[in-house]
Amino acid sequence: VKKIKSKLNAKKFSEGNFLNINKLLTFFIYLLIAYAIFSVFFVFISRLFFPYQLEWMEGGEIEHILRLLDGKCIYCPPSLEFIPYIYTPLFYYIGIPFIKIFGVNFFSIRLVSILGFVLLLSTTYLVVFKTTKNKFWSFVAVGLLAFSYSTTGFWFDLARVDTIANLFMLLSFFFLLDENPKRNLLSAFFAFCAFYTKQSFISVHLFLLLGLLIRDKGLFSKHFLLYFSLILVSTIIETIRSNGWYIFWNFTLPASHYWIWSRVVTFWSIDLLPFYSISLALILGYFFVQKDELFKSKEIYFLLFLIGTLFNSYFLRLHYGGYLNVLIPFVISISIVLPIIVFRFQQMFNSKNIQTILLTLVLVQFCLLIYDFLTPIPTQKDKGEIEYLLNNFRETQGDVYLMGYNFVQRYIGKRDFPHYVLVNDLLIANLKEKESFEREFIYSLKTHKFSAILLDDDLTLKHLDKYYYKTDKFFYHRVFNTKNVFRKEVVWLPKQKDYSN
């Protein structure tokens, strides 16, 4: 009897120890969640009013909105006056009232993204809480997403389409989970909004449609009909308004981009595994254990959400021009699925020591995402370097072509020209639609239309070196959406030889 009592007391003591450890681990995880949320919004506020671009294509988003406000079509034949970004237009339409209310500046459009991110975090919480009814694990999802600010290129607050597109994607997923007729239609509508903001999100939704087909064919047919009807109608309207250029810019030209095959490996070895290896291991382990039950529950949606976002992020990262922002959809799915499967593991094992292991792994996962939140914040020195660059060109007579900039040329009274990325995309493409623009561009170089051209030192541009020469004059400044990277931008001037004939 004494031996049995001593064993029982030892077991109680052991469980008590594990309970105290688990409380401590939970406390530390809450601290990291608070730190993640504080740091991301501290950066947002610190960058919101910065008057220059935080990322080299931010200004182009404003130029698109201004063009719409002037009553002009954004999907037009390419020219030195304007070349559109290769995105569907909903983000620009959303930006119009913000520009009207807050003025023509970066603040107005960054505010769109920041508000979108607040809603994105809220929806992330709601998706996990709907599934687990557990506040702690719902906050874990929010913390993981907030901490992913660094791994996705400090992108959430930029005046770019991504945060809003991802918000629509997640809202669609949230309503899809209910398997309710009315909410099913809301899901289809928000899925269309994601497509109409960034067309590549159709790939994510196709996987979710497969889950709906498996679970409820009646809901699937209505969802499918509404979703693709909205896509078809919007595509027809935009194509008619643009005389067919909507199709070219959003589908034909992106399809012509080449692939960066080295990223087949680096997507995993550099972009994901150093930061999310614990999450991916736990998620794979759970779905392997539950493989026989997946098709019997709503968990099939989470598996297909993971696969769909992985496909989307992987495909775009391999594509020419795919930066770290393309990881956001997959990072959102990891942030949501990890706390849900850890919660499920707790239910499956119902053991304090297993819970300790799981909480420890989650804590380590958070630690892998810690970053220096001062890195992406522009300093006075950064601001001064950009102003020094602009002031140099303010004094230059005639047109200057700042190829890595849009909108900021207005600050120095200079005309805006298409961004380098857009010009280069066209010139390297084997498409007949570029021919008129290429002739115009060659003629502008040949006749020395530009008094000076500014181009990143590590970039090349077809035809440029035939009519302009690279000088020793350069500007050097920090990039705010990449860790410890600087841009060296070199001035090109017209060659003396007369090409006018």
Residue ranges and their predicted role:
Residues 31-34, 111-132, 140, 171:
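Transmembrane-helix motifs of polytopic, lipid-linked glycan transferases
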Residues 59-83, 90:
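Extracytosolic helix-loop segments that constitute the early lumenal/periplasmic catalytic or substrate-binding loops
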Residues 87, 242, 361, 365-500:
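Extracytoplasmic
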Residues 89, 93, 101-122:
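Loop-to-helix entry region of an early transmembrane alpha helix in multi-pass inner-membrane enzymes
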Residues 114, 203, 319-350:
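Hydrophobic/aromatic-rich transmembrane helices and adjacent perimembrane loops
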Residues 124-148, 166-167, 182-186, 248, ...:
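Transmembrane-helix signature of polytopic, membrane-embedded enzymes
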Residues 151, 164-183, 189-191, 333-340:
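Specific aromatic-rich, kink-prone transmembrane helix
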Residues 175, 184-212, 229-234, 309-315:
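Membrane-interface alpha helices of multi-pass inner-membrane proteins
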